[in-house]
A protein has these predicted regions:
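Bacterial N-terminal signal peptides that target proteins for export
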Residues: 1-8
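Bacterial N-terminal signal peptides
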Residues: 8-16
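Beta-strand-enriched cores of mature, soluble protein domains
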Residues: 22-163
């Protein structure tokens, strides 16, 4: 009897794993770059501590190698702290693709590590999105007197979408 129950459990687990693998679609979004305008508001600026809030609005160029997000827009707001030359921060980003479907995520910066990105939620084809990865700033202009600047960032990693 125990062997039959064990065999049934193994069969059920195998079928469940097979269904889960078929029920999800994973995509590698490496090669994605978004460029836009950032506005920084400094709260504290000193030799040992700088704290600022920032807001970024940008777009993924149509020639992006990651086709699902060509012409997508992104809006992020965040908090950053530089203490003894080390960056710490957190931000939330809202993405809208060319069809109007959206997804949201958050980024976390910790000292001496690449920035980490996690998908939180989505609408339309992104409903149930999960996954994450890292990101880096790939181009940055000089900051203007008003705290604004242009920059590009490139996330790398994978997302999983339910089928």
């Amino acid at each position: 009897m125990n062997k039959i129950l064990s065999l049934a459990a193994v069969t059920l687990l195998s079928a469940t794993a097979s269904f889960a693998a078929q029920a999800a679609e994973t995509a590698d979004y490496s090669g994605l770059t978004a460029c836009g305008h950032s506005k920084n508001t400094t709260l504290i600026a000193g030799p040992n501590l700088t704290i600022y809030l920032w807001e970024f609005g940008g777009i993924v160029p149509p020639e992006s190698t990651f086709k699902p997000l060509q012409n997508a827009t992104v809006h992020c707001t965040g908090y950053s702290r530089i203490m003894q030359g080390k960056l710490t921060g957190m931000a939330g980003c809202h993405w809208t693709d060319a069809a109007g479907d959206t997804f949201d995520g958050e980024s976390v910066d910790t000292p001496d590590k690449p920035g980490a990105w996690t998908f939180l939620a989505g609408t339309g084809k992104y409903q149930g999105i999960s996954g994450g990865g890292s990101y880096s700033t790939t181009a940055m202009g000089k900051m203007n007197a008003d705290g604004s600047l242009e920059l590009c960032f490139s996330p790398t990693g994978k997302w999983t979408l339910p089928k």
